[in-house]
Amino acid sequence: MVDENTQDNAPEQEEEAAIVQAGPVSSWLTENGFDHDLLEPDHLGVELIKVSPDFLVPLCTALYAYGFNYLQCQGAYDLGPGKELVSFYHLIKVSDNCEQAEEVRIKVFLPRDNPHIPSVYWIWKAADWQERESYDMYGIIYDGHPDLKRILMPEDWVGWPLRKDYVSPDFYELQDAY
C-alpha cells in the first residue's frame, strides 16, 4: 500500500534536494557582497563556487585575505565539443594547529571560442606553471600571466590537445617533422 502523503510530497522533496545549501565560504562571500553561484559540493563535501571571469580576481583576493593562502591545484577541463571550457582553483586555508583544513573550489566557465580569464599568479605564485599547462592543453588564455607559453608541447604545436574536439595530427606527419 502506498501512502498518499508520500506520493503528493515527492515533487516538493525533489525540489528541496535540488537546492544547494550555502557553505561557510559561500555565506562569507555573500555577507561581504561578492557575486557568485553555488554548485553542488563534490563527493568529499568540498564547497564548489561558480564565478564569472570578471569577478575572479576580486573574489580570489578576498579569499586570500580570508585565509585561503594555499592554491593546491589549478586546472582545466572541457565539457565537450561545442560546450564550455572550465578553469578551476582548489584553495586551502592553511594555519597552525588546524585539525581539518578548510577547502573550497572555484570554477569559471568560459566560451571555447574566446577563453580569456585573468591570471591569479599575482595572488598565488603556485598558479604559474599550472596556468601555463591549462593554456598549453586547452588554449585558455590567462590575461596578465608573466610568461604564458607552452610548457609541455613544442612551441610550434598547433591546437589544444586535451580539448574533446581536437583532431590529432596524422602519425606520419609528426614522424616526418623530425
Swiss-Prot record:
Q: Which GO terms describe its molecular function?
A: NADH dehydrogenase (ubiquinone) activity; quinone binding
Enzyme's top EC category: translocase
InterPro entries for this protein: NADH_DH_suC (IPR010218), NADH_quin_OxRdtase_su_C/D-like (IPR037232), NADH_UbQ_OxRdtase_30kDa_su (IPR001268), NADH_UbQ_OxRdtase_CS (IPR020396)
**SUPFAM superfamilies linked to this entry:** Nqo5-like
- Cystines in this chain: none
Entry membrane topology: Peripheral membrane protein
Main location as per UniProt:
membrane
Q: What biological-process terms (Gene Ontology) are attached?
A: photosynthesis, light reaction
Q: Which Gene3D superfamilies match?
A: NADH:ubiquinone oxidoreductase, 30kDa subunit
Localization, UniProt: Cellular thylakoid membrane
How this chain assembles, per its entry, is:
NDH-1 can be composed of about 15 different subunits; different subcomplexes with different compositions have been identified which probably have different functions.
Q: What is this protein called?
A: NAD(P)H-quinone oxidoreductase subunit J
- The protein's organism comes out as Crocosphaera subtropica (strain ATCC 51142 / BH68) (Cyanothece sp. (strain ATCC 51142))
Query: Which taxonomic lineage is given here?
Result: Bacteria, Bacillati, Cyanobacteriota, Cyanophyceae, Oscillatoriophycideae
